[in-house]
Amino acid sequence: MKRLAALSLVVAFAACGGGEPAREAATDTTAAPVAAATPAAPAMGEMAMTDWFHADDAAKTIHMTITAGLTDAKNHWNFNGGHDGNMTITVPEGYAVTIDLVNKDPAMAHSLGISAVTGNFGIVDPTPAFEGAITSNPASMTDATMPGETERIQFTTGAAGSYSMVCFIPGHAAAGMWVHFNVSADGTKGVQTAM
């Protein structure tokens, strides 16, 4: 009698399927992807030369000091206070660029790279847009630029266009640790903020 009751329950539960064909239910085992943050339009404040951005037009060079965790904005996940695309750095095409990344975040490793990806920062492949435009071990939480460390990168800008400066530590760009990085064909240079 107990066996008959148990068998009846099994048959009853099996009959209560969701009405989907078995084939569809079996093949649809992946969850829908989580939408990543969509970048805002480039910051449109006045173009300025800041104390951390220096240009030498005769030598066609730019030197920047970019500080990760300069402020506590975004839990220190920012570049000179910029995050979520609220800052645009513009550099002329063909200039030699030196960036000193200073990590002032008290607890977290960060990296810096110039990426051709300008939106949907779910998972950003740590591939630089220009040769040399990336810090070492960019996706490592233990070997990237650690708190209190400074790392220098040097590269020459390529084709004019829209790029981004991102932290390649997994999840950092998706959480907002990115700013716009433009390469200008007309020699325009400087920093714009919406902060």
What do these predicted regions represent?
Residues 1-14:
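Sec-dependent bacterial lipoprotein signal peptides
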Residues 76-78, 104-147, 173-176, 180:
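Histidine- and aromatic-enriched segments that form or immediately flank copper-ligand environments
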Residues 51-55, 85-113, 151-159, 163-165:
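Beta-strand cores of secreted/periplasmic/IMS beta-sandwich domains, seen most often
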Residues 23-47:
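Post-signal peptide N-terminal segment of mature Sec-exported envelope proteins
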